[in-house]
Amino acid sequence: FFFQAEDGIRDDLVTGVQTCALPIYSQAKAAVGAMTQEESQEIIRKACPGPGGCGIAASFNTWGLAMEAIGLMLPASSSIPAVDPEKRAECRRVGAAMVNLLQRNIRPRDILTVAAFRNAAVTIAAAGGSTNGVLHILALAREAGVDFTLRDLQQIFRSTPVLASFAPRGPRTMVDLHHIGGTPVLMKHLLDNGLLDGSCLTVTGQTLAENLRDVPPPPAGQDLLVSRENCYKPFADMQVCFGNLAPEGIVFKVSSMKDPRFTGRAVCFDDPRDIVRAVEQRRITPGSVIILRYLGPVASGMPEVLIATAALAVPELDGKIAFLSDARVSGVSHGAIGVHCAPEAAVGGPIACEEDGDEISFDLLEGEIGRAHV
């Protein structure tokens, strides 16, 4: 699931990591005039020449890291590239592990403890992962009957530093992690930095600490992982806020946001395509808080709205506005983005009552969001 772009794409069009989101970004940018249709089509043809999912810390790999950290995947399974010969050996190990689990009567609920969920949350936070991981963790906790909530994630995200330079926040990919030893090296690094609970049982039949006992530290000279003292950020790129706009919570991804506080005037939309048109017509200005609603689970199955966040990533707006929604966003989205706003608009959540011009403020480290005048 790792891509390398073909030759011939202009360096200023496609730089760094190549992902399956590039075609969507290019289409959005072409729609608002930030690149030509010809340039967009060139990216669509050449950005994704290989099989699999994108190789960055977006939704796909966020969940892979979470599952390995929670103990439901064999060591290194989440970081072996899709077309690597090691995948066949991994499949053979899975068969043997299944037999071992059956013989020892180890069941999912023996592994899925509160501590295991904390390990998963810490790992995706330290890796700079996607907000979609929050949805999956909470859904799995509910299914397993484990008391682990958005409030727990809020505390973890506040206290977990970012120790990895995965794209989209940095230049590295999962293939880079694979080259330095895979996900076990990342997890051993987190364990050595006091961030993981090594006593948790895993699908190997051993504890997490036992699985990682012989894993070496990150090799000298690598630039993917840093120590806790030299962290990229003292708190996670994901943060959770509550307030009169989101009484049941809203999840932020703010990797490119320097100030954890933001205040701006609402500009409201009910369709992501209207945001693309508004950007094209220059109707959105710096300092705005873009509200996109009626896209939650009840309203429309909670779709991903990358076309909207991609359109807002034009230079004159990038890092200068906030985006709030009851929808989901892609893990490659960047900026000040708050999603999963609850209650959603379709069930009468406060986000449905927002009007253009309303003043909205949020403070990520205080965990608060709200309308200035209620």
Where are these regions (language model features)?
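Catalytic or ion-coupling anion/metal-binding cores of large enzyme and transporter domains
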Residues: 21-320, 325-344, 349-371
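Single conserved hydrophobic/aromatic residue that forms the stacking wall/gate
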Residues: 1-20, 372-373
